[in-house]
């Protein structure tokens, strides 16, 4: 008998709150039967799923080892921690929170340094003048090496940062940094600026699957159910349901509504009594309502959608294709 599917989520702070809220909106309610300090949890109604509460960096490591099936973590940690990440894990879906950029930042006093090409010139001149390589403080060692290599920069050495990376140039432990930032305000406060082409990665929280986990029948079915919930919620959030009834509706009018307002008719054209159900992007609701009334509709009602369940689930299809490849 196969073991449970293990879903790893961040164990503290805003990331944990956002992850739990994300799953909750999809009808997947995470709970800790052992209390708030427990590092194991469950999903209500899914017996074959175990929640593991880990740090975001540990989640990336456990995905690489295959000890968890699915995990919520930042793409920056996936790319940094996992060698050949695209072969070993699948970024199933972005989750809409935890957004931040991994960037190259230099002192604002370096007024002539705006690009990576400028930095390459500075690096060469720095070594000639000081007889040592320029120091780059960072926690993102692998991302830094790859990005600098792509720009042909070799005259530098990495100083691994264990604390507040943005303070390294000010205290003299590095000339520049590679760090993650969401607004850039902390960098500015420390006298730093991001190079014009210095964004290494635009990261956010992702739902990630491990190739090396045990994907036997039980965990695979649990993953299908979880991804079905997530896709149904995501699909619903893109639309509002519009209902109306009038005799003047025909295929040409539906085609025009689709082309102008992006609507879909999930149940086909109007019924024999003229009832019509459409799914419409929220920003187009008023325009669609005006269009329908102009064509003879007396009343148009609009309702929010909780879930839209399709026969096919592209998220699970992506996972299946990845595991077969």
From Swiss-Prot:
**Activity regulation note:** Feedback inhibited by histidine.
Broad enzyme group: transferase
Checking CDD domains in the record gives: PBP2_HisGL3
Where does the record say this protein resides?
Answer: Cytoplasm
Pathway-wise, it operates in: Amino-acid biosynthesis; L-histidine biosynthesis; L-histidine from 5-phospho-alpha-D-ribose 1-diphosphate: step 1/9
Q: Which Pfam families match?
A: HisG
Task: Tell me which EC number(s) this protein carries.
Answer: 2.4.2.17
Cite the GO molecular-function annotations of the record: ATP binding; ATP phosphoribosyltransferase activity; magnesium ion binding
What are the GO cellular component annotations?
cytoplasm
- Which InterPro entries does the UniProt record give? ATP-PRT_HisG_long, ATP_PRibTrfase_cat, ATP_PRibTrfase_CS, ATP_PRibTrfase_HisG
Q: Does the keyword Glycosyltransferase apply?
A: yes
- What is catalysed by this protein? 1-(5-phospho-beta-D-ribosyl)-ATP + diphosphate = 5-phospho-alpha-D-ribose 1-diphosphate + ATP
Q: Is Disulfide bond given among the entry's keywords? A: no
Q: Which GO terms describe its biological process?
A: L-histidine biosynthetic process
Cofactor(s) it depends on: Mg(2+)
Q: Which UniProt keywords apply?
A: Amino-acid biosynthesis, ATP-binding, Cytoplasm, Glycosyltransferase, Histidine biosynthesis, Magnesium, Metal-binding, Nucleotide-binding, Transferase
- Family of the protein in this entry: Belongs to the ATP phosphoribosyltransferase family. Long subfamily.
Q: What does this protein do?
A: Catalyzes the condensation of ATP and 5-phosphoribose 1-diphosphate to form N'-(5'-phosphoribosyl)-ATP (PR-ATP). Has a crucial role in the pathway because the rate of histidine biosynthesis seems to be controlled primarily by regulation of HisG enzymatic activity.
NCBIfam families from the entry? hisG (TIGR00070)
Name the UniProt record assigns to this protein: ATP phosphoribosyltransferase
Question: What taxonomic lineage is listed for the species of origin?
Answer: Bacteria, Pseudomonadati, Pseudomonadota, Alphaproteobacteria, Hyphomicrobiales
């Amino acid at each position: 008998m196969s073991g449970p599917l293990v879903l790893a989520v961040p164990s503290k702070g805003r990331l944990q709150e956002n992850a739990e809220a994300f799953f909750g909106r999809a009808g997947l309610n995470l709970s800790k039967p052992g209390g708030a300090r427990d590092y194991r949890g469950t999903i209500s109604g899914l017996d074959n799923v175990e929640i593991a509460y880990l740090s975001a960096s540990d989640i990336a490591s456990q995905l690489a080892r295959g000890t968890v099936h699915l995990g919520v973590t930042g793409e920056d940690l996936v790319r940094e921690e996992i060698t050949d990440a695209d072969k070993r894990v699948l970024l199933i879906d972005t989750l809409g929170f935890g957004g931040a950029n991994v960037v190259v930042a230099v002192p604002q006093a370096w007024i002539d340094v705006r690009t990576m090409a400028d930095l390459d010139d500075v690096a060469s001149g720095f070594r000639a003048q000081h007889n040592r390589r320029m120091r780059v403080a960072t926690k993102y060692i692998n991302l830094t090496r790859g990005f600098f290599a792509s720009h042909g920069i070799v005259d530098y050495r990495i100083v691994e940062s264990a604390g507040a990376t943005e303070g390294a140039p000010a205290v003299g432990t590095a000339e520049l940094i590679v760090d993650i930032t969401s607004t850039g305000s902390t960098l500015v406060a420390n006298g730093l600026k991001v190079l014009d082409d210095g964004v290494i990665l635009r990261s956010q929280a992702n739902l990630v699957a491990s190739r090396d986990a045990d994907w036997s029948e039980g965990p695979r079915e649990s993953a299908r159910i979880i991804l079905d919930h997530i896709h149904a919620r995501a699909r619903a959030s893109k639309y509002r349901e519009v209902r109306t009834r009038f005799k003047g509706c025909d295929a040409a009018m539906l085609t025009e509504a689709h082309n102008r307002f992006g609507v879909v008719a999930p149940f086909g054209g109007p019924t024999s009594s003229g009832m019509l159900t459409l799914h419409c992007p929220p920003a187009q609701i008023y325009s669609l309502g005006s269009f329908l009334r102009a064509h003879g509709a007396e009343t148009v009602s609009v309702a929010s959608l909780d879930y839209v369940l399709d026969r096919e689930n592209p998220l699970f299809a992506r996972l299946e294709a990845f595991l077969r490849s």
